[in-house]
């Protein structure tokens, strides 16, 4: 069958498009004017063969249809990838999440107060709430001023746009010449504090004292394979937060609000049964994954579904297609906010295996606190005009979500 992931009909309803592709052609070769790659939408193949520690499919050439900035830090393959993750994992421990819970609650309250103060009781939910909450929390976790959040979002948007729209050699250099000096300043300041304190081999005991307890500090003190992180690796941590800590959670919040309000009976039910908030979040992640697909690159010639693929072939695995696989999910084409958690959580929106998203717990926590507060503080929320999808063909979210609450 003919299938174009960038065609208007695919962009308008990617869930239906990738479900049809999975049913009619579970392994598809796409050749477009700018890209050539294979596409798979089969849940079990993606989870069990591609997302595990595959000897064939590599992450180190980037997560895009062409090779991009990679092979450093998080953008590596095992075993180094696992060692690098382990160096930063303590920052996502339950004790740390409890600390961030207070910040999430504070920011949610501030954003809701701002909404309630608007005299006409209407506005864009994306602009007023879905964007600033994850963006500000990302700043808190990274250790940057919350006031920088829109600046960071601007940088992230540029990087993501370049990543998924035909990146060319050297195309990232101009924007990185803005980003790297900014973060180098933060990292140098932390290194200077350690030097002033006479600490040459820092460990976690300096966090919350000599250094602020944030991820830029953790990048400075972390050790991998017995050595400190290189500056390039430290910057990779910053970039991971910049690009991974914002848009996906922004789209989670906007997508869920959109689905709840497009069928008002869902919103009414959630108000009556607030215990369903967690189920609704997981169903949103399954039904409307913020990232529609990911890429891997073959390290050697291989064969899939009888098709020979060369070394350095690109494979796109469809998250939205896998998330609607009827072999895994009952009635997969329906948004069911009461879908059992055990079933809904089988979604692959946070990945699986060695590259499972480290930020998944914080994204879930942000959404859980946000919607618990929204149904209580703004019970009359309703759609107030047409919505608009995000521009990127690899993402799925609402960048315009007009609502009213008076």
Language-model region placement:
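Cytochrome P450
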Residues: 1-406
């Amino acid at each position: 069958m003919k299938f174009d992931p960038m065609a208007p009909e695919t962009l308008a309803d990617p869930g239906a498009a990738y479900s049809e592709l999975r049913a009619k052609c579970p392994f598809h070769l796409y050749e477009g004017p700018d890209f050539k790659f294979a596409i798979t939408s089969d849940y079990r193949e993606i989870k069990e063969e591609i997302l595990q520690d595959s000897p064939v499919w590599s992450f180190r050439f980037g997560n895009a249809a062409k090779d991009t900035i990679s092979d450093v830090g998080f953008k590596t393959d095992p075993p180094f990838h696992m060692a690098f993750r382990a160096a930063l994992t303590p920052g996502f421990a339950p004790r740390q999440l409890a600390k961030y819970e207070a910040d999430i609650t504070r920011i949610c309250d501030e954003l809701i107060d701002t909404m309630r103060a608007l005299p006409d009781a209407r506005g864009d939910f994306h602009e007023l709430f879905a964007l600033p909450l994850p963006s500000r929390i990302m700043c808190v976790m990274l250790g940057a001023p919350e006031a920088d959040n829109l600046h960071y979002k601007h940088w992230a948007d540029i990087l993501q746009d370049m990543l998924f729209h035909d990146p060319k050699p050297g195309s990232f250099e101009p924007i990185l010449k803005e980003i790297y000096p900014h973060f180098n300043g933060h990292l140098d300041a932390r290194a200077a504090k350690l030097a002033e304190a006479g600490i040459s081999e820092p460990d976690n005991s300096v966090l919350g004292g000599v250094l602020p307890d944030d991820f830029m500090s953790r990048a400075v003190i972390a050790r991998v394979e017995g050595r400190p992180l290189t500056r390039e690796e430290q910057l990779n941590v910053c970039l991971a937060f910049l690009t991974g800590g914002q848009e996906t959670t922004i789209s989670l919040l906007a997508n869920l609000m959109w689905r709840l309000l497009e069928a008002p009976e869902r919103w009414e039910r959630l108000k009556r049964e607030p215990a369903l908030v967690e189920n609704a979040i997981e169903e949103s992640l399954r039904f409307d994954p913020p990232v529609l697909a990911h890429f891997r690159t073959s390290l050697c010639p291989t064969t899939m579904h009888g098709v020979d693929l060369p070394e350095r072939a690109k494979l796109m695995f469809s998250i939205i297609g896998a998330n609607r696989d009827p072999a895994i999910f009952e009635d997969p084409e329906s948004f069911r906010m009461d879908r059992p958690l055990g079933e809904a959580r089988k979604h692959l929106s946070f990945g699986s295996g060695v590259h499972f998203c480290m930020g998944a717990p914080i994204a879930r926590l942000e959404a859980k606190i946000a919607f618990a507060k929204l149904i209580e503080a703004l019970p009359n929320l309703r759609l107030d005009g047409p919505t608009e999808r995000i521009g990127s063909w690899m993402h799925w979210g609402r960048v315009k979500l007009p609502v009213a609450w008076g």
